Swiss-Prot record:
Tissue specificity annotation: Expressed in a variety of leukocyte lines.
Binding residue positions for Ca(2+) 2: 198, 254, 256, 258-259
Name by which UniProt lists this protein: Integrin beta-7
Sites carrying sugar chains: 68, 279, 434, 477, 531, 590, 665, 674
Task of the protein: Integrin ITGA4/ITGB7 (alpha-4/beta-7) (Peyer patches-specific homing receptor LPAM-1) is an adhesion molecule that mediates lymphocyte migration and homing to gut-associated lymphoid tissue (GALT). Integrin ITGA4/ITGB7 interacts with the cell surface adhesion molecules MADCAM1 which is normally expressed by the vascular endothelium of the gastrointestinal tract. Also interacts with VCAM1 and fibronectin, an extracellular matrix component. It recognizes one or more domains within the alternatively spliced CS-1 region of fibronectin. (Microbial infection) Binds to HIV-1 gp120, thereby allowing the virus to enter GALT, which is thought to be the major trigger of AIDS disease. Interaction would involve a tripeptide L-D-I in HIV-1 gp120.
């Protein structure tokens, strides 16, 4: 029978999404999602009608609970703003309500090695309470120490189909050697054994009675009846018991190429009590020489019920319901292994290796090794895989409640080096014994949780875990809460967070009027301009108890001011450097402009030699606005004016090299300059580039010191290159190249023409059709005469 590795690889790739979703630790509880339709995590802080809605609307929002904080006509929603804005508007710091998320470490035993790996503390802290404000992340520090000699449980799961006959002989002598090698890295190790073949129905196994009793090819061989999974030996530290039980095993047989290994893996992970797993590092060694059946294959044998994910071992250790349930999916296997904290090691032959390599990508913290044809290298393969798995630390979480997001940063090599963020897990590779690695776990909630949630973090393959108690901060803790407060019109409402909550039938900011007075003309007159007939509250609010309660960003006695109508700079109100009040930007210190777009600094306006804008302009927004006739960033240029380089060229040359037009009176003509030689590299375009009369190239930089003296930093002279020879040779070479090109082009065109004509001639020759014909004047010398009597004699007589 021929294996189908490529088909299985394709199936594995298609099931990747399923396994990645399924292979999470089971949830400890589900939380119901609750959302406030007024809230959004996007944008900046916006006004909100209450303290609770304010702190939920955006993580940057704060609430001012000071009494009478809002101005006349200003909505109470304006109490909700950024901390800086509220302080700028006069809210005392002690009156700010700005709850922040926090974390509290409840249990933090220090990391320790323990005695021979037993009792080691490898993960810290152990329990943390985290309170999340929606939209605000909280970061946890999780430390892991790789302890020496951590205990190990190893379960050897072997394919006993007939093709594994040679391997079984080798495994019968494996127990002692495997224990000895494992005891080199840990002082507490136990091993167990299980085997598998396939489901005992067609087309996987022959159901002919004689074949069910003896499925091997020849009668002389020792052979057992086929089975799905058989748990042979529970985990033990007795190597002789392992070798004795394995020695009693014999191979079996099946029909098709893939084996029923998934059934065996699932039962070994689910039946923890029967297998005898301890709460230590758990390894499952899976050996086979072929691929595996997966979910859906059972339908070929009339098995339609999906695997139920429960243990079904009978008293003899056999999987008793293998013919009732289909094979498990990759996702089910990955989830069961992850939930049981088991690390699988797939030891397979070269023919099946590509399939199991793809499978390993879908199962967290698994390893694959190539098994020799007779399993002679299985001990070394197990040791290599164990060392690889134990040196890889993978931090993973249980299922998250709706609305909570998590990300990881891994700090593997030191405090300065952090790996990139990952959404699903944190991982450090090649962790040495006694080395401590750190993970930064960031938690963020988008909305409130109806109840606390327990989140579990653990390092795969290790028994310890960190329990995180997740709470959400969804209300204000105002200390001024007062029922029937005197501030609210002598007890007509309750005071909470600086705002009156009126009793039934009462209205107004201070509950000062009743519902019956709501439409009184006298009250409405207070919401219009004197002798005005326009809409109440300028159409930007509603009239309540004779006062305007403005909506949105409007304010003022009649809501006449719009605090969102100020000019914007780069799309931001007041450029982000001021506060908009009644259509006018009130800029922060050192900012000017209608949209606070200008900085008060003038550094960019000071020229090296001419002061502010070279004396030919004024500085506005840290940029020079030049007078008529001048231009340039510093107003230092004009039509017909010399550039700074031209003005100072002669002084730079005579001061540095004692040459040039001013060489004889340099000290007098250049008294206002200070020339120095500079060996610094030329970093920008501010350097002047000039030549002396003898073609010497030099550079200099014009600067201005604090005393108003012009400083010229001159680089040493550089001999100008003579390009005459290069120009002449280039011209000659160009002419020659053009001539050769023309000749070659002509010859090429002639060649193409000749080839085309010759090809046409050959084609015409092939189409000639010479016909053979006779001369019409020619008469043959042969005459043929037919005897009619001869023809009658040949005819039969009737």
């Amino acid at each position: 029978m021929v294996a189908l590795p490529m088909v299985l690889v394709l199936l594995l790739v298609l099931s990747r999404g399923e396994s990645e979703l399924d292979a999470k630790i089971p949830s400890t509880g589900d939380a119901t999602e609750w959302r406030n339709p007024h809230l959004s995590m996007l944008g900046s802080c916006q006004p909100a009608p209450s303290c609770q809605k304010c702190i939920l609307s955006h993580p940057s929002c704060a609430w001012c609970k000071q009494l009478n904080f809002t101005a006349s006509g200003e909505a109470e929603a304006r109490r909700c703003a950024r901390r800086e804005e509220l302080l700028a508007r006069g809210c005392p710091l002690e009156e700010l309500e700005e709850p922040r998320g926090q974390q509290e470490v409840l249990q933090d035993q220090p990391l320790s090695q323990g005695a021979r790996g037993e009792g080691a503390t490898q993960l810290a802290p152990q329990r943390v309470r985290v309170t999340l404000r929606p939209g605000e992340p909280q970061q946890l520090q999780v430390r892991f120490l790789r302890a020496e000699g951590y205990p190990v449980d190893l379960y050897y799961l072997m394919d006993l189909s007939y093709s594994m006959k040679d391997d079984l002989e080798r495994v019968r002598q494996l127990g002692h050697a495997l224990l000895v090698r494992l005891q080199e890295v840990t002082h507490s190790v136990r091993i167990g054994f299980g085997s598998f073949v396939d489901k005992t129905v067609l087309p996987f196994v022959s159901t002919v009675p004689s074949k069910l009793r003896h499925p091997c090819p020849t009668r002389l061989e020792r052979c057992q009846s086929p089975f799905s999974f058989h748990h042979v030996l529970s985990l033990t530290g007795d190597a002789q018991a392992f070798e004795r039980e394995v020695g009693r095993q014999s191979v079996s047989g099946n029909l098709d190429s893939p084996e029923g290994g998934f059934d065996a893996i699932l039962q070994a992970a689910l039946c923890q009590e029967q297998i005898g797993w301890r709460n230590v590092s758990r390894l499952l060694v899976f050996t086979s020489d072929d691929t595996f059946h997966t979910a859906g294959d059972g339908k070929l044998g009339g098995i339609f019920m999906p695997s139920d994910g429960h243990c079904h071992l009978d008293s003899n250790g056999l999987y008793s319901r293998s013919t009732e349930f289909d094979y498990p999916s990759v996702g089910q296997v990955a989830q069961a292994l992850s939930a049981a904290n088991i690390q699988p090691i797939f030891a397979v032959t070269s023919a099946a290796l590509p399939v199991y390599q793809e499978l390993s990508k879908l199962i967290p913290k698994s390893a694959v090794g190539e098994l020799s044809e007779d399993s002679s290298n299985v001990v070394q393969l197990i040791m290599d895989a164990y060392n690889s798995l134990s040196s890889t630390v993978t931090l993973e979480h249980s299922s998250l409640p709706p609305g909570v997001h998590i990300s990881y940063e891994s700090q593997c090599e030191g405090p300065e080096k952090r790996e990139g963020k990952a959404e699903d897990r944190g991982q450090c590779n090649h962790v040495r014994i006694n080395q401590t690695v750190t993970f930064w776990v960031s938690l963020q909630a988008t909305h409130c949780l109806p109840e606390p949630h327990l989140l579990r973090l653990r390092a795969l393959g290790f028994s310890e875990e960190l329990i995180v108690e997740l709470h959400t901060l969804c209300d204000c803790n105002c200390s001024d809460t007062q029922p029937q407060a005197p501030h609210c019109s002598d007890g007509q409402g309750h005071l909470q967070c600086g705002v009156c909550s009126c009793a039934p039938g009462r209205l107004g900011r201070l509950c000062e009027c009743s519902v019956a007075e709501l439409s009184s003309p006298d009250l409405e007159s207070g919401c219009r301009a004197p002798n005005g007939t326009g809409p109440l509250c300028s159409g930007k609010g509603h009239c309540q108890c004779g006062r305007c309660s403005c909506s949105g960003q409007s304010s003022g006695h009649l809501c006449e001011c719009d605090d969102a109508s100020c000019e914007r700079h780069e799309g931001i109100l007041c450029g982000g450097f001021g506060r908009c009040q009644c259509g006018v930007c009130h800029c922060h210190a050192n900012r000017t402009g209608r949209a606070c777009e200008c900085s008060g600094d003038m550094d960019s306006c000071i020229s090296p030699e001419g002061g502010l804008c070279s004396g030919h302009g004024r500085c506005k927004c840290n940029r020079c606005q030049c007078l008529d006739g001048y231009y340039g960033a510093l107003c230092d240029q004009c039509p017909g004016c010399k550039t700074p380089c031209e003005r100072h060229r002669d002084c730079a040359e005579c001061g540095a090299f004692r040459t040039g037009p001013l060489a004889t009176n340099c000290s007098t003509a250049c008294a206002h300059t200070n020339v120095t030689l500079a060996l610094a590299p030329i970093l920008d375009d501010g350097w002047c580039k000039e030549r002396t009369l003898d073609n010497q190239l030099f550079f200099f930089l014009v600067e201005d010191d604090a005393r108003g003296t012009v400083v010229l930093r001159v680089r040493p002279q550089e001999k100008g290159a003579d390009h005459t020879q290069a120009i002449v040779l280039g011209c000659v070479g160009g002419i020659v190249a053009v001539g050769l090109g023309l000749v070659l082009a002509y010859r090429l065109s002639v060649e193409i023409y000749d080839r085309r004509e010759y090809s046409r001639f050959e084609k015409e020759q092939q189409q000639l059709n010479w016909k053979q014909d006779s001369n019409p004047l020619y008469k043959s010398a042969i005459t043929t005469t037919i005897n009619p009597r001869f023809q009658e004699a040949d005819s039969p007589t009737l």
